Amino acid sequence: MAKEKASSQEQEQKVKDEKLKQLNLAVESLEKQFGKGAIMRLGDDAVVQVPVVSTGSISLDYALGVGGLPKGRIVEIYGPESSGKTTLALHAIAEAQKAGGIAAFVDAEHAFDQSYARKLGIDIKSLLISQPESGEQALSITETLVRSGAVDIIVVDSVAALVPQAELEGEMGDSQMGLQARLMSQALRKLTGAISKSNCVAIFINQLRDKIGVMYGSPETTTGGKALKFYASVRLDIRKIAQIKDGTEIVGNRTKVKVVKNKVAPPFKTVEFDIIYGEGVSRIGELIDLAVELGIVKKAGAWFSYENDKLGQGRETVKTLLKADEALFNKIYAQVKEQMVGLKLEGSSDDDSSSDS
């Protein structure tokens, strides 16, 4: 009986070994045909930490779970008008350029503001910009730039402005049902693989529309059909929640961003920061909020203190101080970043780190 059991186990092992041998041959064949990394085991060393491009916001980078927008993926930024969508995308371009990357901006809205982009830290001279005449042209330009493998980040502003050629050639009032949705679906099928191979971040800015006749749930939806929702690895919902005033003058907006979808880390995190008119994301204001939250800067009533020294009374006073004292800003920034990395490492044992949708 024992001999029969041993013989049966040997036979099973032989079958397993033969299967493994055939599998390895198939993997080798696929790698020869399609290149290294075309197929891999999740436990292989080839799977490394996701390379990213910073958003320009410390808190949003942290909320994204990997330190920024993942390279080789599609990102959708959507929200109401004047909520900060383009500002956030321009900050990402500036960060990519600072890291030595090449950036492109497909301006389908024909509304690119050079002076504002320069204020956000973008090198205008090296930025590739296109103002296409139709949706097909915009997506064709995007595909060509992505397939070149030389572009690190590309922004399409916006999906709503990608007008199909047939609609442009038609008469006002002609019904063109589903043309834009079909255009986006077809383009994204082609783009997804190319974006992954080129390690480029593709940001699509989108607008909101109201669905007609919705009684329950949110009536809001994004333009361009459902394809972008599925193909995007990260979706960011950006909204302005309050005005920032200097006396009676409105100088900016308090902005809330929710990570609605995230395929590289846990989703549904929400962050808030200031967007100042003409300056973009207020890194100083954001740093103060995070430093207080992490206990690096102490707040008692309206007074702020750091390492037993009083910084000032009121948030705006502290912002002015940190703007003037770069050394102090850098010192607090380094401590905040160090603590946030520590928090991320402590929370990195979660098994379920992706959104299903």
From Swiss-Prot:
InterPro entries the record matches: AAA+_ATPase (IPR003593), DNA_recomb/repair_RecA (IPR013765), DNA_recomb/repair_RecA_CS (IPR020584), P-loop_NTPase (IPR027417), RecA-like_C (IPR049261), RecA-like_N (IPR049428), RecA_ATP-bd (IPR020588), RecA_C_sf (IPR023400)
CDD domains given in the database record: RecA
Binding site for ATP: G79, P80, E81, S82, S83, G84, K85, T86
Any GO MF annotation of the entry: ATP binding
Pfam families: RecA, RecA_C
Highest taxon above the source species: Bacteria
GO process annotations (BP): DNA recombination; DNA repair; SOS response
Function field: Can catalyze the hydrolysis of ATP in the presence of single-stranded DNA, the ATP-dependent uptake of single-stranded DNA by duplex DNA, and the ATP-dependent hybridization of homologous single-stranded DNAs. It interacts with LexA causing its activation and leading to its autocatalytic cleavage.
Annotated protein name in UniProt: Protein RecA
